[in-house]
UniProtKB/Swiss-Prot annotation:
UniProt-listed CDD domains: Ribosomal_L30
Keywords, sorted A to Z: Ribonucleoprotein, Ribosomal protein
A Gene Ontology biological process term: translation
Natural source organism: Psychromonas ingrahamii (strain DSM 17664 / CCUG 51855 / 37)
Protein name: Large ribosomal subunit protein uL30
Length: 58
């Protein structure tokens, strides 16, 4: 299956609790942390929810 790289580019401090939980659910821990995830509708939905805090490649 195809994969995408998701990088956190903004802090989760002061954000909505649901958005902080989404960042954690994506496996991101700190700014400039990158994870490689499967390109599924569920992951895409999570990325769309916090699009202003992450950068997506691939």
């Amino acid at each position: 299956m195809a994969t995408i790289k998701v990088t956190q580019v903004k802090s989760a401090i002061g954000r909505l609790p649901k958005h902080r939980a989404t960042i954690t659910g994506l496996g991101l821990r700190r700014i400039n942390h990158t994870v490689e995830l499967e390109d599924t509708p569920a992951v895409r939905g999570m990325v769309n929810k916090v699009h202003y805090m992450v950068k997506v490649e691939g």
